[in-house]
Amino acid sequence: KPNPAEAIGLDESYSRRKSYDHWSPNGVLVKNLYFHAEGRLSFSSPDDGSASAFDSFVSDPDNPVPFSAEIRTTQGHAWMVEDQRFAARRPDVLVYESEPLEQEVLIAGPIIASLQVSTTGSDADWIVKLIDVYPPDAPDNSPRGKQVRMGGYQMLLAGEVLRSKFRSSYEEPKPMVPDEVTQIDFDLRDKYHRFLKGHK
């Protein structure tokens, strides 16, 4: 009897499964994505001259960013793929998008987001999301009989929250030094997802 696969990935774009003897799959290339000016996201690293560039926002604890566009007491069944445009429109949310993809991109394995951040206070909550942005002409979808406009849909793939003081340890919280740039790493967990051509 053959050994079971170490991992089975579901490629929802083509409704097919693929078995892998090793995870992360052998042959996967480790690629970095970089923030650029004007909300751009690219596989190319920024020029040296932009190393000191930064984006900023004002966070109001009395007006936090909700996890859902709907008012609900539970997460519901669809929150992990909910359209994120409700958050992207807010002035206290930074959004970075790639150009429309010229070819498909399959991600398979762990995702780490490494941020250089500072705050005027001694603590802050940081939220990082990985989103698949559909093209404007994407056909509509009708899950469970409900019509969903998919043009420009921002499908949530991963999202993690981290309070600054727990960036190194939950057992020994460490406050931020106001206005001092500090590195914070987010583990967005392993993902298996195909970004189709034309998506961002």
Where are these regions (language model features)?
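C-terminal, loop-rich substrate-recognition/catalytic regions characterized by aromatic stacking residues
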Residues: 1-200
